[in-house]
Amino acid sequence: AEAEPGLFPVKLPDGTEIESEPERIASLSPAATELLAELGYSDRLCAVSRYCDYPEGLPEVTAGSSENPDIDKLTELSPDVVFTMSALAEREMYTLDSAGITVVTLSAPKTLEDFGKLYGTAAGVFSGSEAGQAAAEKAVSELKSSASGVELGTFIYVTPKLTAAGSDTFESAVLSLCGRNLCTGAGYAELSGETEAPQYIVAADSLTEADISGNAAYSVMISSGAKVLFVPAVRFERPSARLSEVFRALSEQLSGSATAE
């Protein structure tokens, strides 16, 4: 949608100014690309990162990644805005800024509010802060409604690295919409045997039952009656409306285990 006149310049929450509605953009992150496509701006992409694989029909031109951007390629393409999920080096920022390219850094969320801010910032770049606010509220309310009807009770979440996600992580924030995380520490940690056994061990789908039961702390929980459920962990890494797939996976497995009993 075309932005109304008078909406620009837009000041983003981190102070970045967007002078006018961007016509050509580049993304250095699969998460940013998916979000921009969901908001309807994939047709403005002139370059993506070499890891971007969703949705279909992305430009074939690549410009590195957030960690290792191809600054020469970006200055040559000269998009209005470059989206990244992690801060670029000062020197890279300076080079792009000197070339008249604005860098918008989207932060990986840790809370539902952060998840909304992702949408707010991305939508605000194109349509102003009011539209950004509306996009943020819509994203959070849709995520909450996708969790309704799923009841986990108590859980812990096991990451692809076999660590447990603490209460200040995004995985915990999302799964806490339908249950209570018993791993109350900060960040991602190895669990000691002292953590109370949850009703469910929710695990990244790159793991197997054997990976979980082969871990001392988790095997104790399983013998105390914890059931193992698997969810698509990549959804937490690329937060978008496709997070609903996490709740769909839980719902299918929970209804399956209920009928199996």
Regions found by a protein language model. Give the residues of each.
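Alpha-helical, coiled-coil/dimerization segments enriched in small aliphatic residues
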Residues: 50-54, 166-190
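Bacterial Sec-exported substrate-binding components of ABC uptake systems
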Residues: 1-33, 71, 125-156, 249-261
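Proline-aspartate-enriched helix->loop->beta-strand connector
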Residues: 66-87, 101, 190-207
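Short helix-initiation/N-cap motifs at beta->coil->alpha
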Residues: 5-12, 61-72, 89, 186-192
